[in-house]
Curated annotation (Swiss-Prot):
Keyword annotations from UniProtKB, A to Z: Ribonucleoprotein, Ribosomal protein, RNA-binding, rRNA-binding, tRNA-binding
Protein name: Large ribosomal subunit protein uL5
GO biological process: translation
Gene Ontology CC terms: ribonucleoprotein complex; ribosome
PROSITE patterns assigned: RIBOSOMAL_L5
Function: This is one of the proteins that bind and probably mediate the attachment of the 5S RNA into the large ribosomal subunit, where it forms part of the central protuberance. In the 70S ribosome it contacts protein S13 of the 30S subunit (bridge B1b), connecting the 2 subunits; this bridge is implicated in subunit movement. Contacts the P site tRNA; the 5S rRNA and some of its associated proteins might help stabilize positioning of ribosome-bound tRNAs.
GO molecular function per UniProt: rRNA binding; structural constituent of ribosome; tRNA binding
Length: 179
């Protein structure tokens, strides 16, 4: 059991159970999965850029990244159906908890002028999406070896029914939201 998962079971579950008056600990919302996505529009012309993104996302997540391909052809973007346009990884269980721990305690504090995450990334159903401008904040990547910094989306899917439940869950786990 990872450190963050232990915090969830020992501290977060009782707090949420008391706050929302759940009768069973199984009703308490939890984290289902974490999805990481890098979208590279320029990768359709540059194959080296795509390979680099896959390698870096694999290093960050600890799991092999999968190439995402275009569903439709768009002539104005010089895009054909099936061309690679990005890569993604879905983390569950142990790797998910390890990644969230690393994100909250190491990566986010390394962001320049970091004052917390705005809480407007919730989708109305308790899931949270966070955009990162530079993926070099993760300790697995050496800033000197990264040719061009890439942005990425991180989506945390929870079993919460509302944004209030989801925010309290992530807040109790240690997600640094703006006050």
């Amino acid at each position: 059991m990872t450190r963050l998962e232990q915090i969830y079971r020992e501290k977060v579950v009782p707090v949420l159970q008391k706050e929302f008056n759940y009768t069973s600990s199984m009703q308490v919302p939890g984290i289902e999965k974490v999805s990481l996505n890098i979208g590279l529009g320029a990768a359709s012309q540059n194959n080296k850029l795509m390979e680099e993104a896959i390698k870096e996302l694999t290093a960050i997540a600890g799991q092999k990244a999968v190439v995402t391909r275009a569903k439709k052809s768009i002539a104005s973007f010089k895009l054909r159906e099936g061309m690679p346009i990005g890569c993604r990884v879905t983390l569950r269980k142990e790797r998910m908890w390890d990644f969230l721990d690393k994100l909250m305690n190491f990566a986010l504090p390394r962001v320049r002028d970091f004052r917390g995450i705005p809480d407007r990334g919730f989708d109305g159903r308790g899931n949270f999406t966070l955009g990162i401008k530079e993926h070099t904040i993760f300790p697995e990547l050496e800033v000197d070896r990264v040719d061009n910094p890439k942005g990425m989306n991180i989506t945390i899917v929870t079993t919460a029914q509302t944004d209030k439940e989801g925010k309290l869950l992530l807040d109790q786990l240690g997600m640094p939201f703006k006050k």
